[in-house]
Amino acid sequence: VYRLFTSMFLHFGIEHLVNNMLVLFVLGSRLEQVIGKLRFLFIYLAGGMTGNIFSLILELRNQDFSVSAGASGAVFAVMGAMIYVVIRNKGWLGDLSMRQILVMAAFSLYFGFTSSGVDNAAHIGGMIAGFVLAVLIWHPRKKRDQQMEIYDQL
């Protein structure tokens, strides 16, 4: 069971680590400002674990086992949560639009599916988990308070 957690902190090389951290920096810092540190941490860790569990279930089903490492499932959970937050904020969060997030997600998924050795199941599982977790744990304040929070970010 611990491998489902610890694999989020291992990477197959510097490029793998840098790609994950770049997306995490761009989206994660904004998401954390809106939903708070504890909710962000919960979505990151639980979303990453859920992505890894989703991957494991598919591996067991297909009897096709491989080594899995990386924060991608957790990063995709952040992406999924960010999609929900932006939907709730009428398509924008500061200077970040829904279109930009969806393009980032589409490119990330495209590169995953066109490259070998990528755990796409963890990516998709993480993204779904992040979206669902955000729905369950983030309830924006009244519209006026939420707008003021967005303006404070600018």
Tell where the protein language model's regions lie, with residue ranges:
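A detector for small-residue-rich transmembrane helices and their helix-helix packing motifs
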Residues: 1-154
